[in-house]
Amino acid sequence: MLSFDEALSRLLSGARQVNEIRSLPTLAAAGRVLAETQYATLSVPPLDNSAMDGYAVRVADLSTIGSCLPVTQRIPAGSIGTTLLPGSAARIFTGAPIPPGADAVVMQELCEHGEGGVVINHLPHAGENIRRAGSDVSAGSSILAVGQRLRPQDTALAASVGIARLPVFRRVRVAVFFTGDELRMPGAALPPGAIYNSNRFLLTALLEGLGCEVRDLGQVPDNLEATRAALREATHDNDLILTSGGVSVGEEDYVKPAVEAEGRLDMWRIAIKPGKPLAFGQVKVKMDPAGREVAFIGLPGNPVSSFVTFLMLVRPFILRMQGVQATAPLAYALRADFDWLHSDVRREFLRARLNANGGVELFENQGSGVLTSAVWAGGLVDNAPQQVIRRGDTVRFLPFSELLG
């Protein structure tokens, strides 16, 4: 068996990045992967401006609390005032540029109307309540790096410096199909021995959450020719083929021989629990003069095995195809509020969640077919091979918030 780290390394080295670039309106770019580093074309804020509603003043004019200054101008956001003369104040609002001559803003709560002006009940220091030009972003600075998945705050930052369109990589196109004559779709009758196809919903949603363009080829009969035909169809205009089920070594598992007939299989068994049977290879595109191949990953059929292997192996593979530079999930070192004394030669990913005491608790049944464990959990405990865990130990916790998307 391959170790988890070796399997992941091989997967990532075999991921071919999608280099086609699309130009999208910044408003539509969230969730996509940036194709070119972006630089600020202007400073933010472009001018010194007021951090709050109040009065712009000259500090030198305020020697005592209670000074009364005439208000000579009103400066709302979006307008520019004139030079503030000595011995006067300007009514100013949040975001409005500081008028020349002023060197502080006194918040309106510290002021009151007086006869002939405004009474300043505070002695400000120079620069008080002033946001300096370029304090957020300096013109010419790098604001967004190539290879990062754009979040709402990223597109907002781009918009703040006037970037109307962003270059992003084309979505990764993934064809999926599912094997197993026992599978039925929800809503259909369920004869004895049949089960509903939960993996179809699981994997489609996981792929869409990663921003993939999903082509669902549906259910494939459990025989070699049907599986080979599905593989050939899946190569058409796709970057990755993903299957669920049929990757074991049983007589009724046809994905492995089908991939070997239509291409090549590079690895097969991984020391991971759940999810030991996993196939990775390439499927040849028929009649392609360039000899193009499409990456293939076959996941195990058990729902939790499929879920965990997707998160820990397929997700970083797809991120690398998308051009994302950082593929490793953020992990937290937390206290175990459980005992796990069943050491295994494989690397284990245990369904767990945080409790109210700041520790991690474990779902009681860690079986690979127990989908309720993934629903109950808030993440995975990454447990090294042959490692037992005792209450109070520090464990490596991977929250689903880092893994889903």
Please provide the spans of the model-predicted regions.
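Short, low-complexity N-terminal leaders and the immediately following helix N-cap/first helix
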Residues: 1-66, 325-349
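Generic structural signal for well-ordered, non-membrane alpha-helical segments
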Residues: 1-8, 22, 26, 48, ...
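Short, glycine/charged-enriched hinge/interface segments at domain edges or termini
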Residues: 2, 13-15, 55-216, 233, ...
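Helix-rich terminal scaffold detector
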Residues: 4, 164-299, 303-309
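Generic secondary-structure signature for well-ordered alpha-helical cores
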Residues: 9-20, 35-39, 135, 142-155, ...
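Flexible glycine/proline-rich
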Residues: 22-27, 36, 137, 260-405
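Short beta-strand/loop turn elements enriched in aromatics
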Residues: 22-26, 44-69, 101-116, 350-374
